[in-house]
Amino acid sequence: MAEIEENTVFEINDFTIVTDMEHFGAAFEGILQKYEFSSRRPCLSNDVKYRLIVTDTNMISIGENKLRIELLQPVPASSNPSNDVEFVEAPKDEIEEDAHVIPFTVAEEVANLKHGFEVTDSFLLKFGIRECIIISPNDSSGTFTDENQVNTVMGNIKTILHSSRCEVPVFCYIKDQSLDMISGYASDGNSTYNFSSVVLRNINRRHCSMTDLLYLFKEHLGASISAFHEEVRMSSRFTHVVPLKQSKYFRNHTVETFGLLATGPTSSLPFDILEIAATWRFFRENSLTENHSHSDFDINYSSYWNIKMKSTKSSLLGVLDEILGVYREDTRKAIRSDLNCALILGKHYTQKELPNAFQKLTINSASEVKIGKHAETEDSGTNGPMPPALMKSWVNFIFNEAESDNESLAHELNMLNAASMSENQLSDDELVNNVKLDTLFNYKNPKSANTFLAPYKCAKKSTVTWRLAIALANARVFMSDQPRAEPQLWVEFLLKLREKYEKMETVEKVYNGIDHLQCSFSQKMQMLQLCIDARQKRHRMLDSAHSANNSDEFFDANESFNAETILEPNNEGRLKLFGLNLVEIPDVPMYIPVTQDACPLTDEMIDARNEHLFSLDEEDRVHLQMELVKSDMQSFKAANAGAVFADFLRWHSPKDYDEKTNTISERMLISNNVWVRSWEAALPIPVANQARIFNDTKIAEEILEIFNNATLDQVREWMKPTVFAATLERLTEIESSYGVSEEKQKQRTKTAKILANATLNNTPMDYNEISKYCSQIEMIHNMKVHLMQLFENAREKMHPPYPSETDVQSAIKQLVNIAVHNLWDNSTDEEPTFVIKPQDPIGRAIAVIGKLDELTEQQLINGHRKEYIFNWKHSCPSTTTIPMTHRMYADLRSDKHSLYFSMANDCNFSNSSYL
């Protein structure tokens, strides 16, 4: 071979250009090779229910347009979508030996009469196939604008399908996918199936009955009617939307349910539509007739019914959603809630002249203290939208005071009930039904426990705060048309709280100091109660001192008193004998002094105190922390004249004094010890004359001032943890009326833990999740109660045999599952179905609920939606060809008629055929 010269120039003569369509064809063929669709596809068993899912997606470009290629394959309905069906290909040798050993899968599935209205997949219902490839535009800019473009693409696809020996049907959408205009093709090399759809907007009358559609089907095939032809097999489904008679739901307020957190619908019952899809399974041509004037399709004698109960989401929202709705930002507020409650009431509130808080802080001596109950409150209050008797009952409920006049409360509640029903006149039956419903909605569990599902940081169930939260929430519901009822109740609560404080009456339960596991408002109420307790204790001490001494005997200072005067022993402030004698005066017994209590602290006060301590220098910080010890030293010196530091340690800190060796511990002997310095500086002052460490008057007035100045938003925020806890606990109580599954119990416990975290850390996201959960659970409860009432009323009107309790509960569960599936936006699973036979007891009960016997023949003919499936085994295009099954599915609605054709042909004229 001669060597190529260095400057040799090569000339390229091949200028082949790859078109966009050729590029598309090559890419599409590569996808088919990836799927290995080059042989017969197996027929799936009819014993297993399958559903079509997208198992793979690819993108192909035609010029600047991008097409999405999706593979839809069947998986068992009960399996995980990832567990695809394994398709086993037939051996190639076997196919070549006898082409009819394994039939053309598409032909078998189109002819399958079980592919009727029992299926739920769109392509299976429309065309009768269970596996396909779908070509659709990836966005609106890449749509096929007319059938010519689709025919060009489908022509290329047909060539590829034949050359690759792929039998899987391929569909292509025309224009926008929502129009549902489809063209498709499938072939096994010998016969073909062409798929197409027709969507009609301007409805022609000839397309509106089964008889007309049958003629249209045969005309589309170009078939002449002959007595020798096999009869067409048909199936039909008529959907009837029956409005249920809806009377507005009125809450029936009673004395028994007065203190329960309200539940149930806000105004209307959940369900207002009964949807029945009556199906007649495949029957022969001419066995049933339907035309413009007559129909043999009696809904009560169909093969089976598919039942749904429908409603809008807004009508399903209940009272608890309204109660928790004030904590959502998107909730429209009826009144301004950023104002003080007294300002919201405006002219409806008579302001009370409360004593100035500073006046109570200037008490310097026992002579200025008023002993016993005093300071009767002046007449004041509100005259807002809530009647006085009802307001009094609410306040008594909050403070757990016995209602002295239940008859008056019952009268006010009856007036409230009458006012809500005055707009509509209800019949006696409707009133009875309303009372029955109210009993079910306001179920009260007599065995309800006082414990929580999780450790919420909120008020406990037996506290005033818990009852206040329920009362304020119910005020928003009981008088929803009067938004000022809530601030009115808050103002009345404060007036009663002030009155009880002045009279030193119990305002909250407190056991061992402030309970830091409760919410901030509950801690404030506990602090207020501790202030009342401290005030009572101080008054008892003063009363005791007054009775023990002559009222005219006083220990006044001598006129010659000066700095050198030696104080005489003072016996004031002694509680009891300690049991030991003084160290330096062995003959004198030692007394335990009356001491001050430490100031109880709420969480907010602890945070404020810690912040203040960190701002001080070390000396001032120690001085502040020794405040209580210094008070004890003063009390001890006053009770034990002549006592030394060692005596104080023997009582206050026994571990720092050794009785055997009579020595003080080393830590107390450190030079410049703060304890020693404090002892030397302490004066003998009994506790009655000391400055109060726990200034109950100041703290109580500060709390009451905070309450008085709070805006409605602040009040609601204080109640927030308790309201959410009360809502979740109320749902748990009403769920116990019909029982819940173990799975739901676990979900409830999980939700309770989320709420516990929300109340502890005040996380808005957790509160929103709880609000959504409570709203959903209440919806389900309302639906169940409504269905229970509907079936109970139907039982009273129907003849035996009656549906069993098990059948009714099963029906309620399935109907609720369907309604819930259609409501939640995140429902991705297949819609559940409720199938019954019309003549079964439960079917007859449904018929009574929907009053189906009252449907006229014209109502039956003009159903909300009519669907037909036509199957015809017919020789096409000529009588000499092999008979193949043709299929048409018709979907007739008020605004659109859609026809879907699966047309067979045993002739194949493609030059790529592998005959």
Swiss-Prot record:
Q: Does the keyword Cell inner membrane apply?
A: no
Q: Which residues form the signal peptide?
A: none
Q: Name one GO molecular function term.
A: GTPase activator activity
Q: Which UniProt keywords apply?
A: Cytoplasm, GTPase activation
Q: What is its main location?
A: cytoplasm
- Record's Gene Ontology CC terms? cytoplasm
Q: Which GO terms describe its biological process?
A: amyloid fibril formation; autophagy; positive regulation of autophagosome assembly; regulation of GTPase activity
Subcellular location, record wording: Cytoplasm
A Pfam family this chain is assigned to: Rab3-GTPase_cat
Q: Which residues form a coiled coil?
A: none
Q: What is the purpose of this protein? A: Probable catalytic subunit of a GTPase activating protein that has specificity for Rab3 subfamily. Rab3 proteins are involved in regulated exocytosis of neurotransmitters and hormones. Specifically converts active Rab3-GTP to the inactive form Rab3-GDP.
Quaternary structure annotation from Swiss-Prot or TrEMBL:
The Rab3 GTPase-activating complex is a heterodimer composed of rbg-1 and rbg-2.
Family assignment? Answer: Belongs to the Rab3-GAP catalytic subunit family.
PANTHER family hit by this protein = RAB3 GTPASE-ACTIVATING PROTEIN CATALYTIC SUBUNIT (PTHR21422:SF9)
* Identification of the protein by name: Rab3 GTPase-activating protein catalytic subunit
From what organism does this protein derive? Answer: Caenorhabditis elegans
